[in-house]
Every structure is written in structure tokens, then in C-alpha cells.
Amino acid sequence: MKTWKKIMAAAGAAGLALGLAACGGGDSAADANKLIVGASPTPHAQILRYVADNLAKKQGIELEIKEYTDYNQPNQALNSGDLDANYYQTVPYFDEKTAKNNWQFDHGKGIHLEPVGIYSEKLKDIKDLKDGAKIGVITEETNQKRGLQLLADNGLIKLPKDENQQLVAVIAKSKEYNPRGFDLSEVEGPQLVRSLADLDIAVINGNFALDGGKKPSDALVLESPKDNPSLNILVWKKDSKKLEAIKKLDALLHSPEVKAFIEKKWPNKAVLPGF
């Protein structure tokens, strides 16, 4: 009798262990399809919410979206494991930061473009800009180069051949690069729109312009989308254990539905599909 009880107890324990293993396996499968994605509020988080509400469940993906308002935290959070992916940066920014920090990241193809523009609350035409005018540019280096390029493309400044230096400081002090004596100021991206009251013009990234209530038609000048390298991308760790779910998300972000959503959401072309 005792032997029989021992056998039954052992069988029960084995059954319990199998049950717990099965439950654990189910949780693991669910976790593998839950993605925490960091994003800028506009337009990245808006695009991700559309995917979460309309497309993700059909692919068995659950999205949790964390919003960030600066350019440093999303990559740091991805590297530390707090995020499974992020969606906020351009290809040139990705290339520069991953090389500088030795991050083992990967990315998909370009999803969308937010055209950088020159904005003003004092001028109606860029031709009216006077010598010595105050110009605001973003502090973050990669996007700063993009903004300075737009100023150069419009004949306002010249760019040094050696870009591995403090460009704003070099240009501001140089008669060669800044013959009209413009007063260049570096401003944090989210503050650029509100700083327009103290500036003659500012070069503002599309997402910060949108956050500040500006639209492309308000810009004195917009960069051209043709052959533009500054498309925004989904980024993840190369050794992520959730690669299958991440690749599904990246495919959804390149779907006809997302392209149609972008075109409908931003008919003023503040955001352009990149595919």
C-alpha cells in the first residue's frame, strides 16, 4: 500500500512539473511576441499605435510603446535591454552612434522621412534674411550636419571639408564659411520651435516642427526627399531573442496599410513614406 502511495505521489509530482513546464512554455511564447518599442512621440509613436491597433494582433504581436523626447535615451535603453527595438532615428544617425559606442545593433529599411525645414516667425521669404541674423540649429551632431547642409544648399553658409570638428563654432567664427556674419546658436531639438521668438530663423527637424505645431507649408525652405539618406528606421539588437517578432513588426511598418496611413494622416507632407 505504501509503495502504491509512493508511486501515485511521484506521478502527481511529475504531472505537476509537466503542468508548470507547459505553463512556463506558454508564458515564454507570449513574451517572445511582446515587443517594447521606444519611439519619438511624433510621428513614430503615432505610426506604431496604428500598427498596434490595426495590424499587430493579426501577426500575433503585442506592442508596448514607450515615448522619448530626446535622441540619447532610446539607444541606451535598447542597449541595456529595457527596449526590444526603437523607432526614432535616421540611417546616418544610426551609423554614427553605433560606430562611436560599439553597439551591436541592426536595422531595417527606411520607413519614412520627416523633411527638415527652415522656419521663421519674423520672415516670409528666406531672401529677406539680413546679414548678422540669428540662426538656431539643433545641438545633436548628426541632425545638426543635416541642418547645416540645408543652410549651405541655400547659399547662407559654406561647410568645412573636415566635418570632424565643432562645426557651429568653426563656421560662426569664419569669414570663409560664414561671410554674412550670422549668429549661430545651438538649441535642443524640442526647444527649437519655441525659440523662434528669439531667432530670425531656425532649422528644425520634421518631428520637432510637428510637435511644436508647425507644418511644412510654414517653412521658408524644405529639404528635398529625392535621394535623401535621412529615412527613419526600426532598430534592434543583433542578438535579440525576439528577432522573429521584430522582423514581423518591421514588415508591418513597410506594409501598404502603413503607407496609406502616413499619406492620410499627414496630407500636408510633413511625413512622407520612404517605401
Residue ranges and their predicted role:
Residues 115-126, 230-243:
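A bilobed periplasmic-binding-protein/Venus flytrap-type ligand-binding module shared by bacterial periplasmic
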Residues 143-152, 253-273:
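Periplasmic-binding protein-like
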Residues 24-26:
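Bacterial signal peptide processing site
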Residues 65-76, 165-194:
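Short helix-initiation/N-cap motifs at beta->coil->alpha
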Residues 108-157, 259:
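A conserved helix-loop-strand patch within extracytoplasmic ligand-binding domains
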Residues 18-22:
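C-terminal motif of bacterial Sec signal peptides marking the signal peptidase cleavage site
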Residues 30-42, 61-67, 134-135:
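Short, well-ordered beta-strand elements
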Residues 42-64, 73:
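Short, polar/charged alpha-helical segment
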